[in-house]
Amino acid sequence: MKIASIDIGLKRIGVAICLDGKIVLPQDAILRKNRNQASRDVKAFLELWEIELLVVGLPKGGSSEEEMGRRIRHFVSLLELENIRVEYQDEAGTSFEAKELTQGVFRHRRDGKIDSIAAKIILERWL
């Protein structure tokens, strides 16, 4: 089963894929200019890789849980996925963990690497 995960942020969407059920690979993050453009780009990515299951990071706990959860679920609805199952996975601490994993490996530029590594962690937790 081909699986993808996304870590939805306000500026970037981290993306990771797992094509064999074992190895999770971070992909280039999707820059988010607006939600319609971002949803089109995510949907195109899912179609390109023929993804069958999408795992979406969702915050559990914290002061912004309800608001961010609502925004994330709304964004997923914009994808209009018909043949792709969607599941949600707790994303708590994934951005912090991604920064810890990459400390000293590359500079923390705003190019989305951290976001996609967070998506990788989300998918690894789900697996």
Model-identified regions with their sequence ranges:
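Phosphate- and other anionic-substrate recognition elements at nucleic-acid/protein interfaces
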Residues: 2-3, 10-127
